[in-house]
Amino acid sequence: MTTVIKKVLASTLKELMEEKSLSKITINDLTQSCGVSRQTFYNNFRDIYDLVEWIYLQDTEILVGKDVTYDNWQDALASIFQYIADNRSFVLNTYRSFGKEYLEKFLNQEVEHFLTNLIFQEIQVTGEEAQQVEFSISFYTYALVGIGLDWIEKQMPSTADELIEKIERVMLGSIISNF
Protein backbone atom coordinates (compact mmCIF):
# COMPACT_ATOMS: atom_id res chain seq x y z
CA MET A 1 0.00 0.00 0.00
CA THR A 2 2.79 2.41 0.88
CA THR A 3 4.47 1.89 -2.50
CA VAL A 4 1.18 2.59 -4.28
CA ILE A 5 0.74 5.84 -2.35
CA LYS A 6 4.34 6.85 -3.08
CA LYS A 7 3.80 6.19 -6.79
CA VAL A 8 0.60 8.26 -6.77
CA LEU A 9 2.39 11.13 -5.03
CA ALA A 10 5.29 10.83 -7.49
CA SER A 11 3.03 10.82 -10.52
CA THR A 12 1.06 13.78 -9.21
CA LEU A 13 4.22 15.75 -8.47
CA LYS A 14 5.46 15.16 -12.02
CA GLU A 15 2.11 16.41 -13.35
CA LEU A 16 2.25 19.53 -11.17
CA MET A 17 5.83 20.17 -12.30
CA GLU A 18 4.55 20.36 -15.88
CA GLU A 19 2.81 23.60 -14.88
CA LYS A 20 4.76 25.06 -11.92
CA SER A 21 8.28 25.21 -10.63
CA LEU A 22 9.10 22.91 -7.74
CA SER A 23 9.62 25.87 -5.42
CA LYS A 24 6.00 26.96 -5.98
CA ILE A 25 4.45 23.55 -5.30
CA THR A 26 3.27 23.07 -1.73
CA ILE A 27 2.48 19.88 0.14
CA ASN A 28 -1.11 21.10 0.16
CA ASP A 29 -1.13 21.43 -3.66
CA LEU A 30 0.25 17.93 -3.97
CA THR A 31 -2.04 16.21 -1.46
CA GLN A 32 -5.17 17.94 -2.77
CA SER A 33 -4.30 17.00 -6.35
CA CYS A 34 -3.99 13.31 -5.56
CA GLY A 35 -6.64 13.13 -2.84
CA VAL A 36 -4.54 12.08 0.13
CA SER A 37 -4.05 13.75 3.48
CA ARG A 38 -1.00 15.79 4.46
CA GLN A 39 -0.34 13.19 7.14
CA THR A 40 -0.24 10.47 4.49
CA PHE A 41 2.39 12.48 2.65
CA TYR A 42 4.46 12.97 5.81
CA ASN A 43 4.16 9.28 6.69
CA ASN A 44 6.08 8.58 3.48
CA PHE A 45 8.34 11.60 2.90
CA ARG A 46 10.04 14.34 4.92
CA ASP A 47 9.33 17.01 2.30
CA ILE A 48 8.87 17.51 -1.45
CA TYR A 49 12.62 17.27 -2.01
CA ASP A 50 12.60 13.84 -0.38
CA LEU A 51 9.87 12.81 -2.84
CA VAL A 52 11.92 14.09 -5.79
CA GLU A 53 14.88 12.03 -4.61
CA TRP A 54 12.65 8.97 -4.26
CA ILE A 55 11.40 9.47 -7.84
CA TYR A 56 14.95 9.54 -9.18
CA LEU A 57 15.92 6.48 -7.13
CA GLN A 58 12.90 4.54 -8.42
CA ASP A 59 13.49 5.60 -12.00
CA THR A 60 17.18 4.77 -11.66
CA GLU A 61 16.33 1.23 -10.54
CA ILE A 62 14.30 0.74 -13.70
CA LEU A 63 17.08 2.04 -15.95
CA VAL A 64 19.92 0.25 -14.14
CA GLY A 65 18.02 -3.02 -14.23
CA LYS A 66 18.77 -3.43 -17.93
CA ASP A 67 21.57 -5.74 -19.01
CA VAL A 68 24.06 -3.92 -21.22
CA THR A 69 25.95 -5.84 -23.89
CA TYR A 70 28.14 -4.90 -26.83
CA ASP A 71 25.14 -5.62 -29.06
CA ASN A 72 22.67 -3.35 -27.24
CA TRP A 73 24.78 -0.61 -25.63
CA GLN A 74 23.28 2.02 -27.94
CA ASP A 75 19.78 1.11 -26.76
CA ALA A 76 20.82 1.15 -23.11
CA LEU A 77 22.45 4.58 -23.46
CA ALA A 78 19.46 5.82 -25.44
CA SER A 79 17.14 4.76 -22.60
CA ILE A 80 18.97 7.12 -20.23
CA PHE A 81 18.66 10.08 -22.58
CA GLN A 82 15.12 9.10 -23.57
CA TYR A 83 14.18 9.10 -19.87
CA ILE A 84 15.43 12.68 -19.68
CA ALA A 85 13.48 13.67 -22.80
CA ASP A 86 10.30 11.86 -21.69
CA ASN A 87 10.49 13.56 -18.30
CA ARG A 88 11.59 16.91 -19.71
CA SER A 89 9.56 19.17 -17.39
CA PHE A 90 10.48 17.14 -14.33
CA VAL A 91 14.18 17.09 -15.24
CA LEU A 92 14.39 20.79 -16.20
CA ASN A 93 12.42 21.76 -13.10
CA THR A 94 14.72 19.64 -10.92
CA TYR A 95 17.74 21.16 -12.64
CA ARG A 96 16.51 24.68 -11.86
CA SER A 97 15.46 23.86 -8.28
CA PHE A 98 18.31 21.62 -7.12
CA GLY A 99 21.06 22.76 -9.43
CA LYS A 100 23.39 20.95 -11.75
CA GLU A 101 25.00 18.84 -9.01
CA TYR A 102 21.86 16.87 -8.23
CA LEU A 103 21.32 15.73 -11.81
CA GLU A 104 25.03 15.19 -12.25
CA LYS A 105 24.96 12.67 -9.39
CA PHE A 106 22.00 10.85 -10.95
CA LEU A 107 23.56 10.78 -14.42
CA ASN A 108 27.01 9.77 -13.14
CA GLN A 109 25.48 6.78 -11.40
CA GLU A 110 23.56 5.71 -14.51
CA VAL A 111 26.35 6.20 -17.02
CA GLU A 112 29.08 4.66 -14.87
CA HIS A 113 26.92 1.58 -14.30
CA PHE A 114 26.20 1.39 -18.02
CA LEU A 115 29.87 1.66 -19.04
CA THR A 116 31.11 -0.72 -16.35
CA ASN A 117 28.64 -3.39 -17.43
CA LEU A 118 29.49 -2.88 -21.08
CA ILE A 119 33.26 -3.02 -20.78
CA PHE A 120 33.71 -5.66 -18.11
CA GLN A 121 31.28 -7.94 -19.89
CA GLU A 122 33.46 -7.84 -23.00
CA ILE A 123 36.90 -8.22 -21.44
CA GLN A 124 38.68 -9.78 -18.49
CA VAL A 125 41.36 -7.52 -17.01
CA THR A 126 43.70 -7.54 -14.06
CA GLY A 127 46.36 -5.31 -12.51
CA GLU A 128 47.49 -2.26 -14.47
CA GLU A 129 45.12 -3.01 -17.31
CA ALA A 130 42.20 -2.85 -14.85
CA GLN A 131 43.36 0.58 -13.69
CA GLN A 132 43.40 1.79 -17.31
CA VAL A 133 39.91 0.42 -17.88
CA GLU A 134 38.63 2.11 -14.72
CA PHE A 135 40.22 5.37 -15.85
CA SER A 136 38.53 4.99 -19.25
CA ILE A 137 35.18 4.38 -17.56
CA SER A 138 35.62 7.55 -15.47
CA PHE A 139 36.72 9.52 -18.52
CA TYR A 140 33.74 8.49 -20.62
CA THR A 141 31.35 8.87 -17.69
CA TYR A 142 32.37 12.50 -17.28
CA ALA A 143 32.25 13.07 -21.04
CA LEU A 144 28.77 11.60 -21.44
CA VAL A 145 27.40 13.27 -18.32
CA GLY A 146 28.89 16.59 -19.45
CA ILE A 147 27.21 16.21 -22.84
CA GLY A 148 23.95 15.26 -21.10
CA LEU A 149 24.05 18.23 -18.73
CA ASP A 150 24.88 20.58 -21.59
CA TRP A 151 21.91 19.16 -23.49
CA ILE A 152 19.67 19.74 -20.45
CA GLU A 153 21.10 23.23 -19.85
CA LYS A 154 20.31 24.20 -23.44
CA GLN A 155 16.78 22.83 -22.89
CA MET A 156 17.28 19.80 -25.13
CA PRO A 157 17.60 21.45 -28.56
CA SER A 158 17.90 18.07 -30.31
CA THR A 159 16.02 14.83 -29.79
CA ALA A 160 17.45 12.06 -27.64
CA ASP A 161 17.92 9.99 -30.81
CA GLU A 162 19.93 12.75 -32.52
CA LEU A 163 22.13 13.10 -29.45
CA ILE A 164 22.67 9.33 -29.24
CA GLU A 165 23.60 9.21 -32.92
CA LYS A 166 26.36 11.77 -32.33
CA ILE A 167 27.58 9.93 -29.23
CA GLU A 168 27.60 6.60 -31.10
CA ARG A 169 29.84 8.02 -33.82
CA VAL A 170 32.39 9.15 -31.24
CA MET A 171 32.23 6.03 -29.09
CA LEU A 172 32.42 3.56 -31.95
CA GLY A 173 35.69 5.15 -32.96
CA SER A 174 37.24 5.08 -29.51
CA ILE A 175 36.16 3.31 -26.33
CA ILE A 176 34.47 0.34 -27.97
CA SER A 177 37.31 -0.30 -30.39
CA ASN A 178 39.93 -0.03 -27.64
CA PHE A 179 38.64 -3.01 -25.69
Segments predicted by a language model, with ranges:
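Alpha-helical bundle regulatory/interaction domains
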Residues: 1-20, 24-27, 33-179
